[in-house]
Design a protein with these regions (language model features):
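S-adenosylmethionine
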Residues: 1-440
Length: 440
């Protein structure tokens, strides 16, 4: 009699196969599958853990599988590869799942012809997995970092070049742990104290941020269907993104341009900071995404946002020098959010080569919308200097009318008007912010 397949693990396998074959983002594939699923909440949580965990730890898991089998992972069928990864991930990282269950449940999902092989590899890990040696840190440091932190060798080398090897390892280690969810309290509807109290009464752990009073860190998962989020009393926004909004510093009555606004969290935070007084022009290249801002603003009780489809590189003379503040949160390589989007780590680094010029073009165009004495903020969710400090330097070299201005928030201080946040320092996304002021 064949063992019944575990539906949670079966769905996780389907999602992993789909992301491999279609190149779909993990979070999008997962969200789509879970919305259609009738699984229980604990089973959905297991699916999420397996999909994110296997994606994040792929290099480490493949290294282990190759050490346990005479057949290299790259030569195996895609489904079998993902089954071995799922099984090994449970054995290596999920202590709460007994080893026998991890093995048997994984084997039950395998094609009949591959069950013996999958069973043999996983059982071999239970016998000698702890004895497998990783590459030597001294003689093969790049390979050691790659296998230990499941990052491609070229990315390890780049991070070591940027930060130095010791600091880079701290950053890599932090990218292996998803940061706690951070909420931005909508002070148009609730106070931080009220929000914290209500969430605690519902059984969620929340902690006030020591950086921003409107930020609440939530170690527990808070479902999007919770009353506080549904009623717009708060929304999810990483602390780095909230810091960016504070650096922009919009005041009630200001005219603000958010040049690359979708999905809208910085737009919303800015409107709340303005007490819903003034005007925000929220633009994005993708018309299909603008509805996210409109629906989010309605839920939050914000009515000062005007959304339009616009390429931020294309000049609009009607906007010239109308804005007190302009935010250019530009498209970037995303190498600061590996903990949330683990598949980004496997991107070819050369794919981002064209981005700095695109980002600079946005900055050079949108700077013309800033009034004399106004503020221009440039931000990315990457930690690569060519998209960050180097781009700001290129901009300033041809725009002497702008000057960097230092800022400080909760003990976090900029240098030369620029700040790079890394997950090992403050538990945020990797993020870059530059504050530039137009001379009056």
């Amino acid at each position: 009699m064949e063992q019944m397949q575990n539906p949670a693990r079966a769905l996780a396998l389907q999602i992993l196969n789909r992301t491999d074959s279609a190149g779909q983002y993990t979070n999008l594939a997962l969200d789509s599958a879970l919305k259609k699923s009738s699984l229980s909440a604990p089973d959905k949580a297991l699916v999420t853990i397996l999909v994110y965990g296997v994606t994040e730890r792929r290099i480490t898991l493949d290294y282990l599988a190759d050490a346990l089998s005479s057949r290299p992972m790259e030569a195996l069928d895609g489904t079998v590869r993902n089954l071995l990864r799922m099984g090994l991930y449970q054995l290596c990282y999920l202590d709460r799942i007994p080893a026998h269950a991890a093995v048997s449940e994984t084997v039950s999902l395998a094609p009949r012809r591959a069950r013996g092989f999958v069973n043999a590899v996983l059982r071999e890990y239970t016998r000698r997995g702890q004895d497998i040696s990783f590459p030597d840190k001294t003689t093969d440091p790049d390979r050691y970092l790659s296998v230990t932190y499941s990052l491609p060798v070229p990315l390890c080398r780049k991070l070591a070049f940027i930060f130095g090897r010791e600091r880079a390892e701290s950053v890599m280690e932090a990218f292996g742990h998803a940061p706690p969810v951070t909420l931005r309290v909508n002070t148009l509807k609730a106070s931080p104290e009220q929000m914290a109290s209500e969430l605690c009464e519902l059984g969620y752990r929340v902690q006030a941020s020591d950086v921003l009073p409107t930020a609440l860190r939530a170690p527990d998962f808070i479902p999007s269907g919770s009353p506080q989020l549904q009623e717009g009393q708060a929304f999810v926004q990483d602390l780095a993104s909230q810091i960016c909004v504070e650096v922009l510093g919009a005041q009630p009555g200001d005219c603000v341009i958010d040049a690359c606004a979708c999905p809208g969290s910085k737009t919303f935070g800015t409107a709340i900071r303005m007490q819903n007084k003034g005007k925000i022009l929220a633009y994005d290249l993708h018309k299909s995404k603008l509805s996210l801002i409109e629906s989010g603003a309605a839920r939050l009780g914000i009515d000062i946002i005007e959304v339009r489809e616009r390429d931020a590189r294309s000049h609009d003379p009607e906007l010239r020098e109308i804005a007190d503040r302009v935010l250019c949160d530009v498209p970037c390589s995303g190498f600061g959010v590996l903990a949330k989007k683990p598949e980004i780590r496997y991107k070819d680094l050369s794919d981002a080569a064209a981005l700095p010029d695109i980002q600079l073009a946005i900055l050079q165009n949108c700077c013309r919308y800033v009034k004399d004495g106004g503020v221009l903020v440039y931000s990315t969710c990457t930690i690569f200097p060519e998209e960050n400090e180097q781009n700001v330097a290129r901009f300033l070299a041809s725009h002497p009318e702008f000057a960097p201005e230092d800022f400080s928030l909760g003990g976090i201080c900029s240098t030369g008007g620029m700040l790079t946040l890394t997950p090992d320092d403050h538990g945020t996304d990797g993020f870059f912010i530059a504050k530039l002021v137009k001379r009056a």
